[in-house]
Amino acid sequence: TGTPISNSITEMYTMQRYLQYETLRKNGLQHFDCWASTFGETVTAIELAPEGTGYRAKTRFARFYNLPELMNMFKEIADIKTADMVNLPVPKANYHNVAVKPSKFQQDMVAELAKRAERVRARLVEPYEDNMLRITNDGRKLALDQRLMSPMLPDHDDSKVNACVENVFRLWQENSDKKLTQLVFCDLSIPKNDGNFNVYDDIRQKLIARGVPADEVAFIHDADTETKKKELFAKVRKGQVRILLGSTFKMGAGTNVQDRLIALHDLDCPWRPRDLEQRSGRIVRQGNQNDEVHIFRYVTENTFDAYLYQILENKQRFISQIMTSKSPVRSAEDIDETALSYAEVKALATGNPLIKEKMDLDIQVSKLKLLKAN
């Protein structure tokens, strides 16, 4: 597996229970509470609140303790090979974080989400009337495009969607001679052909209006059989279809169209680090004829995007402690490069320069700790 721990620290315990239950039993670690108190520690930190406004103190599993023992035990059942050990010939990825300003409506709506969240927390509404899941979903949609909240709203010029169209078109134009291709990932607002507004059709129409031939823009959702998928992928590999839009679920693992890929665009942020990894794995891959590729991540400032990247950063932090070629330190809280890049995106999305400064200082401290540990 490429992602033994995809979402939560507890997956490590589950993996061990399946594969080395006897070892756990001998060490008195067969119950999760014992395992957790031996190898994990809860850390309280100031985090962004889910609705995108304000902060809260949150206690979570964030640190592994006694890592050498944990890893020695884990390595009885696992061989770990990371990308830096295998050293495959893959292109160098350049990351571009694109932060856009929210519209007046988006700002008002974020404040409204905050009020709703307060009501839910204070138990003033029944769960069937409103709940954090619903607020979270609205927050994600709002950060992507305000028209997802109401199709009557105007198209905001500085939206993520328009910033993405701008970049996609520019790269399409610049690389026309080589017929280089691009992927756009978006898990929300997929095309349903029901006449309602969706981001996919919006992007396609805008690209066609700028002069991109209609047959060069495709949706993964149109290829609804394995045969159609194979045909579509072949077209992308040849450079006949040069812009392909899809969701992580449909266009993640198993999508091998890397041959001419020059850029990948993350229009929204998934819940799990492995999903973001699956996305970038489409382009940073053996068999790509380009030496350098570009990965764009779009965030709307002061919205739910900040919270999502924070979640990814927290999850990536402990995954990186396990999936590493380096020898384990006694206690690990050191963030790795992937977690750092999520932190930067999060800082951008908060729109508060002091938060950015705090992130930068945290990152510096992390790097100094790393140097000290080495």
Label for each model-derived stretch:
Residues T1-S8:
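Conserved helicase ATPase motor motifs in RecA-like P-loop NTPase domains
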Residues P4, Y18-P154, R170, I295-L370:
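Inter-lobe coupling linker of SF2 helicases/translocases
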Residues E11-T14, N256-C269, V293-R297:
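A short beta-strand element within the Helicase C-terminal
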Residues N97, T181-L183, R242-I243:
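Residue-level preference for the first positions of well-ordered beta-strands
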Residues L124-M132, D177-D201:
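Conserved strand-helix element at the start of the C-terminal RecA-like helicase core
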Residues L188-H221:
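Conserved helicase motor "Helicase C" RecA-like lobe of SF1/SF2 P-loop NTPases
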Residues P213-T248:
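Conserved helicase ATPase core of P-loop NTP-dependent helicases/translocases
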Residues R272-N290:
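Conserved SF2 helicase motif VI
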